[in-house]
Design a protein with these regions (language model features):
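Pyridoxal 5′-phosphate
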Residues: 1-134
Length: 134
């Protein structure tokens, strides 16, 4: 089989699968728990966070693990909106975003944010004139 939907998900590398399987089978404590299983899970998460931080050239405390794209998009959108609320309540987005972006935008619109929905052409390119007017 040839898989063409890598925009939605991509098969992890074999070494990632092996590591993940080993951890799932042997280290299943809640990293927030005070017992030894929790400490072991927490240590592994800390190590992974440090590795990602080195790769991304950021601080480990700037790395946040989420369960997937929807949670990540919600966290990013809502976090940025809260952080920059003092700069205004206008948000510009397109009408063809993934549902994990569209839904929080609709929520923000219902909360009083001025969400500007930019049209796109048949190729998915935004209407530049509409964007400039926004």
């Amino acid at each position: 089989m040839i898989y063409f939907d890598n925009a939605a998900t991509t098969k992890p590398a074999d070494n990632v699968i092996k590591t993940f399987e080993r951890i799932l089978n042997n280290i299943y404590g809640n990293p927030s728990s005070p017992h030894s299983y929790g400490h072991e899970a927490s240590d592994i998460m800390d190590k992974a966070r440090a590795q990602v931080a080195r790769y991304m050239e950021c601080l480990p405390e700037e790395v946040i693990f989420t369960s997937g794209a929807t949670e990540s998009n919600n966290l990013a959108i809502k976090g940025i909106v809260k952080r920059y609320k003092k700069n205004g309540k206008r948000i510009i987005t397109t009408k063809i975003e993934h549902a994990s972006v569209l839904e929080p935008m609709k929520e923000l619109e219902n909360e009083g944010y001025d969400v500007i929905w930019i049209d796109v052409d048949k190729s998915g390119k935004i209407d530049i004139d509409q964007f400039k007017r926004a």
